[in-house]
Amino acid sequence: MTIDTLVAFAGIVFLLAIIPGPNALLILYTSLTQGKRFAVVNTLGVSVGFLIHAFISAQGLSLLLSQSAMAFSIFKWLGVAYLFWLGINNVKAALNQSELKIDPKKATLTPSLSSSFIKGLLTNLLNPKIVLFYLSIFPQFVSPQHLLEQSMLLGLTQAMVVSSWFLVVILFASKLKAMLTTPKVTKWLNYVSGGLFVSFGVSLASARL
């Protein structure tokens, strides 16, 4: 694999990264509601997801998944259910939020870094569109003689490119956070992000082989 080939692949994944999707929405929402640290851990989870996708693709499991309508359907609906779960949780958070007062005696539920990592990982892993992307793109960039090594290199490249873009998103969101942390704005942020997660789930439900 040449440097030119790697740069071409990096260009493709960058263009895909800047298109809003479930991963980007998760990072942006976490940045605005929980802070940079948790969003960075989200990003780490997403990045590990790309490496796992690359490994699975190199082992031929992605091809097997794409050739089995039942397996693809099960995988797809797991992804749909997960996006719906994220969306419904955000809407519930908005419904439960009090705009009038916050009782300081009540303990605040702080998300853990591990849960942030798992959210990023699952949002990426349970997306069959990424499986289809790897099946359509990887054969153009890897040679059969070095399938595993080159697939992992491409997965690492995608993880680095996407992470770099998400870090820009996180830094931008951190600048806006001071203006968006009032209870009223946070409530509507939960509503909007919840609706978007559900809409991504609906879009994913229409995915076909």
Model-based region annotation:
Residues 126-139, 200-203:
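Kinked, hydrophobic transmembrane alpha-helices enriched for aromatic residues
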Residues 21, 127, 194:
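Short, conserved phosphate/pyrophosphate- and ester-handling motifs at nucleotide-, phospho-/glycolipid
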Residues 45, 49, 53-61, 83-89, ...:
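Alpha-helical transmembrane segments and their lipid-water interface positions
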Residues 66-98, 162-165, 169, 177-209:
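Selective transmembrane alpha-helices of multi-pass membrane proteins
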Residues 7, 11, 110-122, 149-153, ...:
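Alpha-helical membrane-protein architecture signal
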Residues 92-112:
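Flexible cytoplasmic inter-helical loops of multi-pass small-molecule transporters
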Residues 14, 18, 51-52, 88, ...:
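Hydrophobic/aromatic residues within the transmembrane alpha-helices of Major Facilitator Superfamily
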Residues 3-73, 136-157, 171:
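Juxtamembrane transmembrane-helix termini in multi-pass membrane transport proteins
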